[in-house]
């Protein structure tokens, strides 16, 4: 889940997404940032109460709105202290099984040497640490990176991310065999291949569960592995109910290991739900 923006959340959509998350046996729930609107203490308290209602396992990474917008000294000196207290470590968290490896990268910054601090930044060190972790994945594991900002601009997206270091990170992650880069920030769902390597590293963006809609209804993504394909379904809240708005099916790269993804076909399970 991502871009809930507590303090400006769509309460009905959040309640529906929470019920949905608790109703199905997801392998992992991912929160891709902007959990608060202004990084206020009361907003993080709401986030903490909400996360307590969500199923486990759960993995999270912060967004640019998760720094204290009104407290500039704290934003510069300790931008993610409030996030860490309410949610957990802001960077390099991971979930790992023989079938799945997910690692977070914190693409948000409390401040930057540019006017718009809301844009993303991934250092080369962050990228290479993530690459090294991906290289330790089990041979047949789906490899996933979760961060707030899209590493490269989404075609037709409602806004930009302008991630410094994004192109370098995308190219290195693709070379490392990453299958999915999950993000938020744009408040609109999309699936696009990154233009590197074999073209089978996919940027997957989720919508929003806030009132800050940008041309898409509040919603989240359900991501499943179906044999040698990846299915991404954008769920949308119409004010009364959740429904599948669109589904993308894209091919997954073959694995050199001894296992076979075909063994999953009989009982496909969502490995992650991204509500944003």
Feature locations, PLM:
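N-terminal active-site segment of His-dependent metallophosphoesterases
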Residues: 1-53, 69-70, 136
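Active-site neighborhood of phospho(di)ester-bond hydrolases with catalytic His/Asp-centered motifs
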Residues: 1-2, 29-34, 58-64, 105-106, ...
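Extended active-site neighborhood of metal-dependent phosphoesterases/phosphodiesterases
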Residues: 45-129, 172-174, 197, 222
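Short acidic, glycine-rich surface-loop motifs adjacent to enzyme active sites
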Residues: 134, 138-154
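Conserved beta-sheet core of the metallophosphoesterase superfamily
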Residues: 155-228
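A short C-terminal boundary segment appended to hydrolase-like catalytic domains
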Residues: 225-276
């Amino acid at each position: 889940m991502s871009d809930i923006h507590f303090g400006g959340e769509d309460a009905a959509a959040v309640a529906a997404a929470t019920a949905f998350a608790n109703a199905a046996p997801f392998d992992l729930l991912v929160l891709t940032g902007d959990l608060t609107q202004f990084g206020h203490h009361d907003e993080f308290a709401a986030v903490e109460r909400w996360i307590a209602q969500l199923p486990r396992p759960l993995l999270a990474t912060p967004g640019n709105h998760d720094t204290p917008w009104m407290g500039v000294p704290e934003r510069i000196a300790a931008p993610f202290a409030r996030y860490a207290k309410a949610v957990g470590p802001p960077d390099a968290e991971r979930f790992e099984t023989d079938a799945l490896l997910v690692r977070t990268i914190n693409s948000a910054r409390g401040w930057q040497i540019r006017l718009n601090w809301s844009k993303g930044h991934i250092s080369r060190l962050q990228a290479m640490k993530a690459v090294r972790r991906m290289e330790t994945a089990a041979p047949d594991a789906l490899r996933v990176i979760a961060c707030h900002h899209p590493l490269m601009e989404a075609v037709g997206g409602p806004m930009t991310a302008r991630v410094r270091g994004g192109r370098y990170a995308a190219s290195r992650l693709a070379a490392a065999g990453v299958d999915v880069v999950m993000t938020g920030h744009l408040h609109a769902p999309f699936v696009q291949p990154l233009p590197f390597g074999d073209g089978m590293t996919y940027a997957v963006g989720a919508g929003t569960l806030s009132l800050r809609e940008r041309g898409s209804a509040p919603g989240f993504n359900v991501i499943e592995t179906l044999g040698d394909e990846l299915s991404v379904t954008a769920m949308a809240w119409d004010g009364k109910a959740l429904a599948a708005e669109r589904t993308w099916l894209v091919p997954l790269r073959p694995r050199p290991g001894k296992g076979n993804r075909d063994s999953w076909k009989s009982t496909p399970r969502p490995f992650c739900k991204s509500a944003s």
